[in-house]
Design a protein with these regions (language model features):
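DNA polymerase sliding clamps and clamp-related checkpoint/processivity subunits
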Residues: 1-20, 25-152, 159-355
């Protein structure tokens, strides 16, 4: 049996608003550790991974791993019936064919209950390899949203370039060209110092030998989180022999019909966390919204992406004040938002043949 209670329904509403344009049907994988969703869009150009930790719920119980196949548009409609500050409880029995949602009002004795039909969705277990990136940009999510929305008015693609100068977003359109440069500030380094320490890029640090002025450079590689997915930016979009997914290039994927079914996230098993206090529903508690821009890089990176997808990703700014862009040449872009109850990550294959 599954029972998950959230302090506010607003969290689920914002999550669904962030991903419903990318994924139509998906499995929510529930286990003792929490609730996860992982699926690719129909063109196999983008992948979305959502993690809701068990400790982020006011109450959480999951007796055994179970997938909940839902149509995201239908779930969005059911969630619209709840007020943002309603206490939301999700229930499902073993082998159930319905998902029960209970909304409890904080200001009155009103209790609303909805039963939503579940779907049988074919899913595969994904192999998720560790990935290292050459550059990481940490910035206010509101700034990222503004940039991609502004540039989408002029063109269909954006070139994101990370260099010693800063991070540049450039787009070319029929009527006009645009370029936005964000430089790193010292204030940002301090404010983002502890943000995403487990997600560091590979870099170099100088180690001075004792008794000598000679410096030896050594490469520092920090293991990525298990959710980071390594995808080939050239061709593919299907499982390889080891069960790992590779994204198709943005150019190729946009030409396909939207008839692919999304895939679920790999299940994990961990100790139950029932009864632990829930984290409040709010934006990122790790960094302020006006933190400026922090850039960590090992080498120059320049890639081109579809603005249509980035605009969709930016809807997650409602969940977090801060966004991280992780990049390496010829590797899909990772856009990560962290919030009190977990995180949401997007992977987008770069366009091929564009400067």
């Amino acid at each position: 049996m599954l029972e998950a209670k959230l302090q506010e329904a607003a969290l689920l509403k914002r999550l669904l608003d962030s991903i419903k344009e990318l994924v139509t049907d998906a499995n929510f994988e529930c286990n003792e550790e929490g609730i996860n969703l992982q699926a690719m869009d129909n063109s196999h150009v983008a992948l979305v991974a959502v993690k809701l930790e068990a400790t982020g719920f006011k109450k959480y119980r999951c007796d055994r791993p179970m997938p909940l196949g839902v149509n995201l548009n239908s779930l969005t409609k059911v969630l619209k019936c709840a007020k943002d500050d309603d206490v939301c409880t999700i229930k499902a029995t073993d082998d159930a064919d319905v998902l029960n949602l209970l909304y409890e009002s904080r200001s009155s004795d009103r209790i609303a209950e909805y039963d939503m039909k579940l779907m049988d969705i074919d899913s595969d277990t994904l192999g998720i390899p560790d990935t290292e990136y050459d550059a990481r940009v940490t910035m206010p999510s509101s700034e990222f949203t503004r940039i991609v929305r502004d540039l989408s008015l002029l063109g269909e693609s954006v070139r994101i370039e990370v260099s010693k100068e800063g991070v540049r977003f450039a787009s070319e359109g029929e009527a006009a060209n645009a370029s936005v440069l964000l430089r790193q500030t010292e204030a940002a380094k301090e404010k983002y110092a502890d943000y995403g320490k487990d997600d560091q890029v590979k870099g170099e640090e100088d180690v001075e030998e004792e008794g000598s002025s000679k410096k030896v450079k050594k490469e520092k590689k920090v293991k990525k989180e298990s959710e980071d997915v390594e995808m080939d930016g050239e061709e593919g979009g299907e499982e390889d022999e080891d069960g790992e997914f590779k994204a198709k290039s943005d150019d190729e994927g946009e030409e396909e019909q939207e008839d692919e079914e999304p895939t679920s996230r790999k299940r994990k098993k961990a100790p139950a966390t029932n009864g632990k206090p829930a984290k409040k529903t709010k934006k990122s508690e790790e960094a302020p919204s006006d933190g400026g821009v922090m850039i960590e890089m090992n080498q120059h990176v320049s890639l081109t992406f579809s603005l249509k997808y980035l605009v969709n990703f930016s809807k997650s700014s409602a969940l977090s004040n801060t966004v991280q862009l992780m990049m390496s040449n010829d590797v899909p872009l990772l856009v990560s938002y962290r919030f009190g109850q977990g995180d949401i990550k997007y992977y987008l294959a770069p366009k091929i043949g564009e400067e």
